[in-house]
Amino acid sequence: MVTKYSSIFMSPILSNPPILYFSDCSREXYQKXLTN
């Protein structure tokens, strides 16, 4: 069960950019860090 849940929760996190899980403020700061 541990591996099953790990695959369910980890797969979307690894496949999708972490920026999608940030709030708007964090997202802006994250993009600024990438652009600068």
Swiss-Prot record:
Post-translational modification: The N-terminus is blocked.
Keywords in alphabetical order: Disulfide bond, Fibrinogenolytic toxin, Glycoprotein, Hemorrhagic toxin, Hemostasis impairing toxin, Hydrolase, Metal-binding, Metalloprotease, Protease, Secreted, Toxin, Zinc
Domain Peptidase M12B, residue spans: 1-36
Name assigned to this protein: Zinc metalloproteinase-disintegrin-like VaH1
pH dependence: Optimum pH is 7.5.
Required cofactor(s): Zn(2+)
Organism: Vipera ammodytes ammodytes (Western sand viper)
Regulation: Inhibited by EDTA, but not inhibited by iodoacetamide, PMSF and pepstatin A.
Cofactor note: Binds 1 zinc ion per subunit.
Expressed in which tissues: Expressed by the venom gland.
Lineage of origin: Eukaryota, Metazoa, Chordata, Craniata, Vertebrata
